[in-house]
Amino acid sequence: MKKILFIAPDYYGFNEVVYDGLKKYSNAKVTHVVSAYTQRYKYKHIGERIQNLFMKTFLGRNLKDERQYGELKEVVRNSDFFDQIIINRPDVLSTDDLIRLKSKTNMLKAFFWDSIEKIPSQRDSIAYFDKCFSFDSLDCEKYGFEKNTNFFFAPTMPNQDIIYDVLFLGTQDGRIDKLVKILEHLNRIGYHSRAFLYNHYSNGESEYSKSPFITITNKLIPFSQSYKISSQSRILLDLAQDNQAGLSFRPFEALGLQKKMITDNPNILNYDFYSPENICLIDPENIKISEDFFSKPYKPLDTAILGKYSLEHWIHNIIK
């Protein structure tokens, strides 16, 4: 049986979804190692805290890092050989790690869920890889990456009660001003619209926490759980990042859940699943949404089109 090593951060639980997909669809033995953690290691007891203080002071070692990243370092050091090594966010690995990993496979691959413009440090790792994948069309053209769109992951779940007309899930970032404007407009015309934003450092207090339409939390919503929340809304809202030339995960989440979507990302027009019945492209500075878009039912898509954007298809593109 072929062997695949998958290395990725645990950000938003994306890694677990890909890991499960690799195990299910690759027909290979898959090893997964986390390269970076959303939450720092927490001491199990006061003895560990004292031990770490001693190690840092007298041995130049960090117990927290060794406990959290020990598995990654062990995989890098050992002599195992893999048919493929697939890495997300290679910029969180050291140059020495990348060189050692390259010696453990004939096919070292990377996939990028953020554009190079958004995370410039990713550029330094490109040369180590035999093949790179990205959802960003400009990066594919500029760096010779292979295009692999994001995907939908829709676990089987019971029908959820509809709570919202329009819902946005995301992080508290530079999009928030236009988010506030859109939410105020939608609620003003009578559509119950809300946003839940993640901010790792937030205690819920910010100028935007005063908005009745926005909830800010420092509790991370894993990727696999966000579907349950999104399924409680009739329509999903997607807002483009300034430094991306492709679609984020939200449009594909809408595909998997068969939900309508409002977006300000003009790239949506280039995809074969676009239809004005299901997707409304807006200008946040001049919002125009027809009443028909809200009142008419979702128009189901052809299964062949849906299949192109499934996790299974995404996995097959990566490992082929």
Roles of regions detected by a PLM:
Residues 2-75, 79, 89-96, 113-248, ...:
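Nucleotide-sugar donor-binding catalytic core of glycosyltransferases
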Residues 86:
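N-terminal Rossmann-like NAD(P) cofactor-binding module of classical short-chain dehydrogenase/reductase
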Residues 102-112:
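Short beta-strand/loop segments at the ligand-binding rim of alpha/beta enzyme cores
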Residues 254-255:
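Short alpha-helix at the nucleotide-sugar/activated-sugar donor binding site of glycosyltransferases
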Residues 285-320:
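A charged, aromatic-enriched C-terminal amphipathic alpha-helix characteristic of glycosyltransferases
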